[in-house]
C-alpha cells in the first residue's frame, strides 16, 4: 500500500504524519461546518499527532500569504474564514501567538478589505507617537518592579489589526474610539511556587500607579484557561487618559 511504501522509504514517523494528514483531509470532506469549536476539537483528535496539526497550521499560513494570487473570490473568502475561525484558535492554543495574529490580520485583509487598510494606515501614521507612549508607560513600572526585587521581562505592543477591528465592531466606533490600543506584557521570572504571589504583587504595584478599570480584570490564575494559560489581565488608565491593557 501507499502507507507501507512511505514507511519503507521515509520511516515510521513520516508515514504516521502522512496518515494523520489523510485522516484530517477525510474529515474535512465529510464536514460542512468547519468553523466551529466542535470541528476544531475533532480535527485535533483526528490528527492524533501534534506534528500533523503544526504542519496543517503552517500550510494554512503559507496559503494565506499567497492568497492574493487566488482569483476566485469565493475560494479566497473560504480560505480566509477558515484561517480566522479554525486555524488562528488552534495556533493560539499551541502558544503560537505571532502566527495566530498573522492569520487573523490576513483574514481581515481579505474579508474586510477596506477596514484592514484603514486601520493599517492609521497605525502607520501614529507609530512613532505610540512607541514613545509605550516606552513612557513602561519606564516607571520597570523601576518599581526592580525596586521590589522582582525578576521580570516587560514589553509593550499595539493591538493587532484584527483585535482593533473586533473592538471597533463591538464598541460600534471608529479607530479613534477604541480605548485600549496598547497592551503591555510582564512575564515574571520566579520559582513556580511563587508565581501567583508575585503576579498579584505586580498587579498591586501597577494598580497603585495607575487607576484600574475593575470590570476589565481577568483572573486566569485562580481558574486557568482550558489550554493551561495562567495570567492576570487588567486595563488601567495611563498618561494622557489612555487605557492600557496589562
Can you say where each PLM-predicted feature lies in the sequence?
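Nucleic-acid processing machinery
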Residues: 26-42, 47-53, 60-245
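Acidic/His-rich, divalent-metal-binding segments that scaffold phosphate/diphosphate chemistry
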Residues: 1, 9, 58, 111
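Histidine- and acidic-residue-rich, metal-dependent catalytic cores
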Residues: 2-28, 84-89, 93
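Short amphipathic beta-strand/extended segments with alternating polar/hydrophobic composition
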Residues: 12, 245-246
Amino acid at each position: 500500500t501507499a502507507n507501507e511504501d512511505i514507511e519503507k522509504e521515509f520511516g515510521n514517523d513520516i508515514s504516521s504524519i502522512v496518515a494523520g494528514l489523510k485522516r484530517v483531509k477525510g474529515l474535512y470532506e465529510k464536514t460542512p461546518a468547519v468553523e466551529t469549536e466542535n470541528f476544531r476539537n475533532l480535527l485535533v483528535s483526528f490528527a492524533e499527532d501534534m506534528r500533523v496539526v503544526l504542519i496543517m497550521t503552517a500550510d494554512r499560513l503559507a496559503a494565506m500569504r499567497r492568497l492574493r494570487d487566488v482569483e476566485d473570490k469565493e475560494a479566497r473568502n473560504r480560505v480566509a474564514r477558515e484561517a480566522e475561525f479554525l486555524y488562528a484558535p488552534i495556533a493560539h492554543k499551541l502558544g503560537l501567538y505571532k502566527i495566530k495574529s498573522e492569520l487573523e490580520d490576513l483574514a481581515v485583509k481579505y474579508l474586510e478589505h477596506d477596514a484592514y487598510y484603514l486601520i493599517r494606515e492609521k497605525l502607520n501614521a501614529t507609530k512613532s507617537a505610540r512607541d514613545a507612549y509605550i516606552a513612557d508607560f513602561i519606564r516607571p513600572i520597570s523601576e518599581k518592579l526592580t525596586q521590589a526585587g522582582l525578576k521580570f521581562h516587560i514589553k509593550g505592543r499595539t493591538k493587532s489589526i484584527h483585535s482593533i477591528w473586533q473592538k471597533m465592531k463591538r464598541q460600534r466606533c471608529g479607530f479613534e474610539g477604541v480605548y485600549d490600543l496598547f497592551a503591555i506584557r510582564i512575564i515574571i521570572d520566579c520559582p513556580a511556587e511563587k508565581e501567583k504571589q508575585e503576579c498579584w504583587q505586580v498587579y498591586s504595584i501597577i494598580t497603585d500607579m495607575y487607576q484600574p478599570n475593575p470590570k476589565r480584570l481577568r483572573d486566569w490564575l485562580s481558574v486557568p484557561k482550558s489550554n493551561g494559560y495562567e495570567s492576570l489581565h487588567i486595563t488601567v488608565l495611563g498618561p494622557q487618559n489612555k487605557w492600557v491593557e496589562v
